[in-house]
Amino acid sequence: MRGTDDQLTTGDGRTLAYRRVGSGPTLVCHPGGPGLPGAELADLAGLDDSLELLILEPRGTGRSTRPADPAAYDFEHYVADLEELRVHLGQQRIDLLGFSHGGMVAMAYAAAHPERVGRLLLVATLAHRDEGLDAEMERGLAEREGEPWYPEARAALDEEEAAEFADDEALAENLARQWPLYFGRYGEREAAFVQTLAGLVPNADALRRFNSDVWPSFDLRPQLARIAAPTLVLAGDRDFVAPPAAARAIAGAVADAELVVVPGAGHFIFVEAPEAFRGAVLSFFGVGARA
């Protein structure tokens, strides 16, 4: 991925790395996972033509220091890292995009530091888990049962949720089998994107910690009323991970929120519907696309 690599040293001596891509108003981007280093965001459907994307490599991913204690992969620490990044950048407020798990971190940060967020973009994420959303997820998966890749992909998903991966390399192999599930339609464009993720090295400790200790009782809803920033919530209507019902719950709880549901898109909205994604974000920013 093109761009300029940079990093900061945190108060406790860790490296926190990031990459700058494009030019224009700065948009801090927190990747998903947890445990993905940001390569999956690429240029976010060409947003780098109009914005400077500052793509964080979250703790334990990419060039950022890996914590010795897996307990450090929690929202409190992820939020603290974002605040250290803001201070390092010398900005009173940051515009913040969170994708998937990064959206959870972004909501937690915007609730903890409401005065520090100018605009908040939440992409393919959710703020809670309950039986209703679990049922929505299962319905979304059931819609894909006729696809030729489904049996292997679903088996990989079940293995991942049960933490049946020994290390980073095993998780990378698991995710390679899962990826088709994450698209509303798995065609040539989506397969080409998945090929770009072939060298991606995820952090197994971070995902294992989330699946075992965070996800079972995950609920950020009590914090959402504290978010003061204008907020754009983007969802794909075929996203089994973060279904539209999850996006509607967020938009209904944040005081100044706009909801956009993209027809036909799955989890990677910016890959499957780049024009719709780019248009929604630039409109929210009040920035026109460059010729």
Features from the language model and the residues they span:
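Conserved HGGG/HGGXW glycine-rich cap/lid loop of the alpha/beta-hydrolase fold
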Residues: 7-67, 71, 85
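Active-site loop/oxyanion-hole signature of alpha/beta-hydrolase fold enzymes
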Residues: 58-101, 279
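Conserved hydrolase catalytic core segment
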Residues: 92-136
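Flexible "cap/lid" loop of the alpha/beta hydrolase fold
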Residues: 121-161
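Alpha/beta-hydrolase
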Residues: 141, 152-222, 229
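Short beta-strand/loop motif that positions the catalytic acidic residue
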Residues: 227, 233-235
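Acidic catalytic loop of the alpha/beta-hydrolase fold
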Residues: 238-242
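Catalytic active-site module of serine/aspartate enzymes centered on a nucleophile-bearing elbow/loop
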Residues: 257-291
